[in-house]
């Protein structure tokens, strides 16, 4: 099992390359600090104890290790007990949708994957390994991840563009007996649902009573639609650049929620985004910055809830959000109500690994959303506090416990662990 170094050692005389920055981004001093934090990479592998004698060497490598190898060959489940497999997650990307920057390729994605690995270790005690694949072919990605899967207890897919991500995740989960999660989809959806539970409490409404507009029907948007429908949302409208492309009878949408990528009318909009906003109570943006205006908000019902999650510029600027919305949230850490999938995936994988879960199912996601919402106590729930902070020490243990219990309740744990 590896450990990840959480300290960053900078040389006394730091000489960093000059990097041209687009206008309006970080100052030179901030850029220097950023590159200094990344110098030499942000993670490392270290042994759990020193190899400081011939006797220790013979235990951890030959000849002693041969006994462990034979034990695993006779009973593969032993790998979870005598190797780091049961505490290891592969963080896999093809670099096709890196952050909000687009298709940068696998090498440029590596710093982001290292950051994920640090967060896994710090927040959940999980050893996570960045795997940046030099292919964007779904078949090759599935073959490669399947081939390396014996080393890991879980697969975390990251920054893979839609619609390929849906097929890749499904095929990997079908092929493997360990949990697979595309975080851009399900991590986002879980935290959005948790925040919405509490925002609705603030406004005195119920999920089955409100009209919800999801703007942006990529990986995150479709997963949000699916989980909202599973949670009991009744009136749901989906928009992309073309306009209103997802609407229909509530029961029909709910039954077909797993098929949403196939039934969205991307090329045949039935209205505009403004049409979708008429009378809506909730706007969930997972799209692009500055697409909402005060005039748009006037089309919504009173006390609108707006989750403007585009980064770095939200769909509605904060100064307008606080003025015109009853509840306003972003994906940014410099404003209240940060909706961040960091609240979901460390605890979900911790619970999945601890319970021996073979998948992350819808029941787990719904349970985690409820648990996250309940971590905001009634006495502190307000327009400006609808979701726990990402460093709240209660989050990961509560989420892990919920996932472990849901795995047992739904019968998706490895044989012998029920």
Predicted regions and their residues:
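General beta-strand structural signal in soluble alpha/beta enzymes
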Residues: 130, 156-159, 180-183, 214, ...
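Solvent-exposed alpha-helices and their adjacent loops that cap or buttress functional pockets
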Residues: 79-85, 121-122, 147-149, 173-174, ...
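Short, ordered loop/turn segments at secondary-structure junctions
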Residues: 94-96, 104, 133-134, 159-162, ...
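Glycine-rich phosphate/diphosphate-binding loop of Rossmann-like nucleotide-binding domains
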Residues: 99, 104-124, 182, 186-284, ...
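Adenosine-phosphate binding glycine-rich loop
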Residues: 23, 183-184, 205, 308-417
């Amino acid at each position: 099992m590896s450990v990840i170094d959480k300290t960053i050692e900078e040389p006394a005389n730091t000489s960093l390359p000059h990097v041209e920055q687009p206008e309006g981004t970080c100052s030179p001093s901030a850029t220097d600090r950023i590159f200094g934090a990344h110098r030499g990479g942000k993670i490392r592998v270290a042994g759990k104890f020193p190899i400081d004698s011939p006797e220790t060497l013979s235990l951890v490598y030959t000849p002693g290790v041969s006994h462990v190898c034979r034990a695993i060959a006779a009973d593969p489940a032993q790998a979870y007990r005598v190797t780091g497999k049961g505490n290891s997650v592969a963080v896999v990307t093809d670099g096709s949708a890196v952050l909000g920057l687009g298709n940068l390729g696998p090498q440029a994605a590596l710093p982001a994957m290292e950051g994920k690995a640090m967060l896994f270790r710090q927040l959940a005690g999980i050893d996570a390994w960045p795997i940046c694949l030099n292919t964007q072919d779904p078949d090759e990605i599935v073959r490669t991840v399947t081939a390396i899967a014996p080393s890991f207890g879980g697969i975390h897919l990251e920054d893979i563009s839609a619609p390929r991500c849906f097929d890749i995740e499904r095929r990997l989960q079908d092929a493997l007996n360990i949990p697979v999660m595309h975080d851009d989809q399900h991590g986002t959806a879980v935290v959005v649902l948790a925040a919405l539970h509490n925002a609705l409490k603030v406004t005195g409404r119920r999920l089955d009573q409100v009209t919800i507009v999801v703007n942006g029907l990529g990986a995150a948007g479709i997963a949000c639609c699916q989980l909202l429908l599973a949670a009991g949302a009744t009136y749901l409208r989906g928009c992309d650049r073309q306009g209103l492309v997802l609407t229909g009878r509530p029961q029909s949408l709910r039954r077909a929620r797993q098929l949403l990528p196939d039934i969205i009318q991307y090329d045949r909009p039935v209205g505009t985004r403004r049409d979708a906003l008429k009378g809506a109570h909730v706007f969930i943006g997972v799209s692009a910055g500055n697409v909402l205006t005060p005039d748009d908000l006037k089309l919504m019902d009173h006390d609108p809830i707006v989750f403007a999650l585009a980064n770095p510029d939200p769909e509605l600027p904060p100064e307008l959000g606080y003025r015109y919305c009853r509840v306003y949230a972003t994906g940014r850490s410099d404003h209240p109500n940060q909706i961040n999938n960091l609240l979901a995936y460390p605890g979900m994988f911790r619970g999945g690994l601890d319970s021996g879960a073979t998948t992350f199912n819808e029941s787990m996601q719904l349970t985690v959303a409820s648990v996250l919402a309940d971590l905001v106590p009634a006495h502190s729930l307000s327009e400006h506090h609808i979701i726990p902070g990402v460093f709240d020490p209660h989050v990961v243990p509560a989420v892990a416990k919920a996932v472990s219990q849901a795995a047992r309740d739904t019968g998706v744990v490895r044989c012998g662990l029920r």
